[in-house]
C-alpha cells in the first residue's frame, strides 16, 4: 500500500469546490458566500484531519468552533472578535490557531482567502 507523505498546496484553487457553511456558522449580516478546496483529508483514530484553501466574501457571522484549526490569511481583511474580547484586525500574512469551543464574531471586511488545517473529532 502506497502512503502519500507530502501534500503541496497549489498556487491557485484546484479540484472540486465545497460550498456549505462551516459547522457552527450563523450569519448575522450580509450574505457571505464560502468556497472550500480541500487538498488533504485523512481519518485517523476517530478524528478527521483536513487542509486546503477557504474563501469567504463580505459579511458577518457568529462562529462557535467545533474543531481545532490553524489558518494563514493569504488575502483580504478579517475583523475577528472573540466572545467577550476586543476585536482583532487580521490581514494577509497573519496566522492563528483556534481551539474547540472558541466562539466569537467574524466580520469579513474584504473577501478573505486562507490556507487551513483542521482537526474534527467525532462526537
Question: Where do the language-model regions lie?
Answer:
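Ligand-binding loop in jelly-roll beta-barrel domains
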Residues: 100-123
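Short acidic-glycine-tyrosine-enriched beta hairpin
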Residues: 84-100
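Short, conserved beta-strand element in jelly-roll/cupin
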Residues: 56, 65-80
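A short, N-terminal "cap"/entry segment at the start of jelly-roll beta-barrel domains
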Residues: 1-48
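Structural motif
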Residues: 60, 70, 77, 103, ...
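Conserved short histidine dyad/triad with adjacent acidic residue
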Residues: 39-41, 48-65, 99-100
Amino acid at each position: 500500500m502506497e502512503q502519500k507523505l507530502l501534500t503541496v498546496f497549489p498556487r491557485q484553487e484546484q479540484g472540486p469546490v465545497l460550498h456549505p457553511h462551516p459547522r457552527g456558522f450563523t450569519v448575522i449580516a450580509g450574505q457571505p458566500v464560502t468556497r472550500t478546496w480541500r487538498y488533504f483529508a485523512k481519518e485517523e483514530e476517530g478524528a478527521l484531519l483536513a487542509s486546503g484553501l477557504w474563501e469567504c466574501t463580505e459579511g458577518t457571522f457568529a462562529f462557535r468552533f467545533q474543531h481545532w484549526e490553524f489558518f494563514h490569511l493569504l488575502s483580504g481583511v478579517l475583523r475577528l472578535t472573540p466572545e467577550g474580547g476586543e476585536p482583532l484586525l487580521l490581514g494577509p500574512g497573519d496566522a492563528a490557531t483556534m481551539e474547540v469551543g472558541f466562539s466569537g464574531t467574524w466580520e469579513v471586511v474584504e473577501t478573505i482567502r486562507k490556507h487551513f488545517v483542521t482537526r474534527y473529532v467525532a462526537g
